Amino acid sequence: MAAQGEPQVQFKLVLVGDGGTGKTTFVKRHLTGEFEKKYVATLGVEVHPLVFHTNRGPIKFNVWDTAGQEKFGGLRDGYYIQAQCAIIMFDVTSRVTYKNVPNWHRDLVRVCENIPIVLCGNKVDIKDRKVKAKSIVFHRKKNLQYYDISAKSNYNFEKPFLWLARKLIGDPNLEFVAMPALAPPEVVMDPALAAQYEQDLQNAQATALPDEDDDL
């Protein structure tokens, strides 16, 4: 039974991607989740309970963060088991982190076959972007959702969670009625740059996919 006032609707969300892509920074932005996180020693994981208030009541994502184990190779199956959704993160200033996305995706779907997955390109606040919108095609091949994000500026923080919530609840009209308390931005996302990136993504979306897999 959920405790009094606890959201009845809860989902296990696994957060994966190369070390240094900003996964922990991202999940720590949600202040109550950071305050109430629990450490699971057997798996070496921190679980952050992130609550979002929607027009259909509160939803909790129990976000599993690896605490850096991915630097030592793959993650154990216990991390993925019973995950109901996932975020795969890479760093837009580091091409190798995007090149490794297919490996993370493969590990994930081997254990969790048909779960909704969002791909996030983090650090878009940094001017020296290496992985441009037109080269981000993996999500289109695998039917994932994609968002540019900037954890340190809170840019698009809620987008992956809203998309996952709509998929998991089965309601495309689900909305967040209030934003969670987020840590104050450490950097400011340039609105002109954000607008440019949104346009680039729209243009890329309208372009035919390349046949070869050289871009992965």
Curated annotation (Swiss-Prot):
Principal subcellular localisation of the protein: nucleus
What is said about its interaction partners and assembly?
Answer: Monomer. Interacts with rangap1, which promotes ran-mediated GTP hydrolysis. Interacts with kpnb1. Interaction with kpnb1 inhibits rangap1-mediated stimulation of GTPase activity. Interacts with rcc1 which promotes the exchange of ran-bound GDP by GTP. Interaction with kpnb1 inhibits rcc1-mediated exchange of ran-bound GDP by GTP. Interacts (GTP-bound form) with tnpo1; the interaction is direct. Interacts (GTP-bound form) with tnpo3; the interaction is direct. Interacts with kpnb1 and with tnpo1; both inhibit ran GTPase activity.
EC number(s) recorded for this UniProt protein: 3.6.5.-
Give the signal peptide as a residue range, or say none if absent: none
What is the catalytic activity of this protein?
A: GTP + H2O = GDP + phosphate + H(+)
Q: Mind telling me which residues the site (Essential for GTP hydrolysis) is annotated on? A: 69
Could you give the cofactor binding note from the entry?
Answer: Mg(2+) interacts primarily with the phosphate groups of the bound guanine nucleotide.
Q: Which CDD domains match?
A: Ran (cd00877)
Residues forming coiled coils = none
Regarding protein family, the annotation reads: Belongs to the small GTPase superfamily. Ran family.
- What PANTHER family does this protein map onto? GTP-BINDING NUCLEAR PROTEIN RAN, RAN GTPASE
Q: Extract the ranges annotated as region (Switch-II).
A: 68-84
Pfam families assigned: Ras (PF00071)
Annotated binding of GTP, by residue: 18-25, 36-42, 68, 122-125, 150-152
- Which keywords has UniProt assigned to this entry? Cytoplasm, Developmental protein, GTP-binding, Hydrolase, Magnesium, Metal-binding, Nucleotide-binding, Nucleus, Protein transport, Transport
Protein's job: GTPase involved in nucleocytoplasmic transport, participating both to the import and the export from the nucleus of proteins and RNAs. Switches between a cytoplasmic GDP- and a nuclear GTP-bound state by nucleotide exchange and GTP hydrolysis. Nuclear import receptors such as importin beta bind their substrates only in the absence of GTP-bound RAN and release them upon direct interaction with GTP-bound RAN, while export receptors behave in the opposite way.
Q: What happens when the gene is disrupted?
A: Morpholino knockdown results in defects in eye development and reduction of cell density at the neurula stage. Co-knockdown of nemp1a/b and ran elicits reduction of cell density and eye defects more significantly than the individual knockdown of either one.
Q: Known NCBIfam families for this protein?
A: small_GTP
GO molecular function terms listed in the Swiss-Prot or TrEMBL record: GTP binding; GTPase activity; magnesium ion binding
Region (Switch-I): which ranges?
37-45
Instruction: Give an example GO biological process.
Output: ribosomal small subunit export from nucleus
What protein am I looking at? Answer: GTP-binding nuclear protein Ran
Q: Does the keyword GTP-binding apply?
A: yes
Q: Pull one GO CC term from this UniProt entry.
A: cytoplasm
InterPro entries, per the entry = P-loop_NTPase, Ran_GTPase, Small_GTP-bd, Small_GTPase
